[in-house]
């Protein structure tokens, strides 16, 4: 088939990237990217995860095949879109969420959005390297009009995983600035409606690097009445890019889903 003859993606396929479809999978894993990130890294997890798992990765507006769409700045509006697009993805099989850094906030709010719409929660919520917004360790994010070029560069390196020589290149920073600003607005908007009690009932696992900038991951236990565990792995904020850590996380996710499936039977 010629490239021009390829079928167009559906709206949902544009929002969720599934590189390796697995109709025989028992579970689906929905992944949420870090600040400035795309969908490809987590979508590739589907290549070497167990046959039990089909992986879908959120593709945010304003990047990749959605580059023509306006960037999203508000977590509530983003979650409304994600919850709607998720319906055909999760309707046939048990599912779990995995989010890293900014993706943890989107994953949590999406789980909450599903519950508020009388939809099932994920079997398990896996969060990585994100200081809970209700924690005293939470640091205020500057307003959009307060952000300097130097601060954008900082966020690119610390939360976007961008190598220093790129993050300090003015032209690169200028190019990335709209996306980073939008993503910072999303994270900043998460500070509204902070839970004062357990709002979910699913099990939760938090991963954090031993030298991570994320703090007080223990506070995520407050948001669910389900079982909650914290695991520290060697490395910094992007500890999960280490192949050994990535393999451990994938294996742990599969084990948790198998156990959850049995206990919920």
Curated annotation (Swiss-Prot):
Pfam families: Thioesterase
Matches recorded under PANTHER family: S-ACYL FATTY ACID SYNTHASE THIOESTERASE, MEDIUM CHAIN, THIOESTERASE
Domain of life, per lineage: Eukaryota
EC number(s) stated in the UniProt entry for this protein: 3.1.2.14
Family: Belongs to the thioesterase family.
Full protein name: S-acyl fatty acid synthase thioesterase, medium chain
InterPro entries named among the record's database cross-references: AB_hydrolase_fold, TEII, Thioesterase
Expression sites by tissue: Detected both in lactating and non-lactating breast epithelium (at protein level). Isoform 2 is up-regulated in bone marrow-derived mononuclear cells of rheumatoid arthritis patients.
Subunit description: Interacts (via C-terminus) with FASN.
Active site: 101, 237
Keywords recorded for this protein, A-Z: Acetylation, Cytoplasm, Fatty acid biosynthesis, Fatty acid metabolism, Hydrolase, Lipid biosynthesis, Lipid metabolism
Gene3D superfamilies reported for this sequence: alpha/beta hydrolase
Stated role: Contributes to the release of free fatty acids from fatty acid synthase (FASN). Has broad substrate specificity, giving rise to a range of free fatty acids with chain lengths between 10 and 16 carbon atoms (C10 - C16).
GO function terms (MF aspect): fatty acyl-[ACP] hydrolase activity
Cellular component, GO annotation: cytosol
Subcellular location(s) of the protein: Cytoplasm, Cytosol
GO BP of this protein: lipid biosynthetic process; medium-chain fatty acid biosynthetic process
Modified sites of kind N-acetylmethionine: 1
Enzyme class: hydrolase
Catalytic activity: (9Z)-octadecenoyl-[ACP] + H2O = (9Z)-octadecenoate + holo-[ACP] + H(+); decanoyl-CoA + H2O = decanoate + CoA + H(+); dodecanoyl-CoA + H2O = dodecanoate + CoA + H(+); tetradecanoyl-CoA + H2O = tetradecanoate + CoA + H(+)
């Amino acid at each position: 088939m010629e490239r021009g003859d390829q079928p167009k993606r559906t709206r949902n396929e544009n929002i969720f990237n599934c590189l390796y479809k697995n109709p025989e999978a028992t579970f689906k894993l929905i992944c949420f990217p870090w600040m400035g990130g795309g969908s490809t890294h987590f979508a590739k997890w589907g290549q070497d995860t167990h046959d039990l798992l089909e992986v879908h990765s959120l593709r945010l507006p304003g990047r990749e095949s959605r580059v023509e769409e306006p960037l999203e700045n508000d977590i509530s509006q983003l979650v409304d879109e994600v919850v709607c697009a998720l319906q055909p993805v999760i309707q046939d099989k048990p599912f779990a969420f995995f989010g890293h850094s900014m993706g943890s906030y989107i994953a949590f709010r999406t789980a909450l959005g599903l519950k508020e719409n009388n939809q099932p929660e994920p079997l398990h919520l896996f969060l990585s390297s994100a200081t809970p917004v209700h924690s005293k360790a939470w640091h205020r994010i500057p307003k959009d009009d307060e952000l300097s070029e130097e601060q954008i560069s900082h966020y690119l390196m610390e939360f976007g995983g961008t190598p220093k020589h790129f993050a300090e290149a003015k032209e690169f920073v200028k190019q990335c600035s709209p996306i980073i600003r939008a993503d910072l607005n999303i994270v900043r908007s998460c500070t509204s409606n902070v839970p004062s009690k357990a709002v979910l009932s699913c099990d939760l696992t938090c991963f954090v690097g031993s030298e991570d900038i994320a703090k007080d991951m223990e506070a995520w236990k407050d948001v669910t009445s389900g079982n909650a565990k914290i695991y520290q792995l060697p490395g910094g904020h992007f500890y999960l890019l280490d192949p050994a850590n990535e393999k451990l996380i994938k294996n742990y996710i599969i084990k948790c889903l198998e156990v959850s499936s049995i206990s919920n039977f």
